[in-house]
Structures are given as C-alpha cells and as structure tokens.
Amino acid sequence: MTFESHCINSSLTIKDALIALNNLRNATLTLFVLNDNAQIIGTLTDGDIRRALVNGHGLDCTLDKVMHRDYKFIRQKEFTVANLRSFRDRRIIFIPILDGENHVVDVVNLQKFKSK
C-alpha cells in the first residue's frame, strides 16, 4: 500500500474520510489532508472523526473544519536516524516526509521497524 492511499482533499467530507479509512484495512488509520495544490495542511484519524461527531459535526462536514492542524513531519532534506528516534521517543509512529513545498513525498511507519 502506498502513501497516496492515506491522502485526502480538505474539501471532502467526514463521510468520505470514513470510507477512505475503511479502505485502508490493516494500515495505520491516519489520513493526510491536502489542499488543492496537493500540499499537506493537516492530519485526520478515526479519533478526530469521533470527536467531531460527538461535538455535533455531521457526516457532510468538510475535513478542513475537523482536521488536526498541528501535525508532526520530517523535511525530506532533514531525514535522519536521529530524527526518527526522536519521533519514536514521542510515540509518533506514522510520519509524513515533506519536500520544501509541503508535498508529501513519502511516509515512514515506525511500526514496521524493530526497536534497538
């Protein structure tokens, strides 16, 4: 499964995000929310959706209203083992790798690597 399956446009709805998360099957249940220029502007998890629904948002609410804007990432040129360890130490396991224009170029899933 490629990282593109984790990308979704901010103009889509909570219902669209639920369908996308359901289609991920056994993958990490995190979506990267992109603007119309394919730049990441937030993340969305099943927990974010649950909180949005509990707070009164409907299935037709757009993702830009409920996404998590303070997401963590690594810049492509700063991709190092030390940075990965820092994320693991903070229990962040699914990390988007961004280019200089905030496009997702790859994703690291630390669940797939053994701890040392």
Predicted segments — roles?
Residues 32, 39-54, 92, 96, ...:
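Short beta->alpha transition motifs characteristic of CBS
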Residues 1-7, 45-50:
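N-terminal/domain-start segments enriched in small and hydrophobic, helix-friendly residues
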Residues 15-18, 50, 67, 114:
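Generic structural signal for individual residues within well-ordered alpha-helical segments
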Residues 1-6, 18, 61-71:
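Bateman (tandem CBS) regulatory domains
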Residues 7-28, 34, 53, 73-92, ...:
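The conserved cystathionine-beta-synthase
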Residues 28-29, 40-45, 55-63, 76-77:
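Phosphate-interaction motifs
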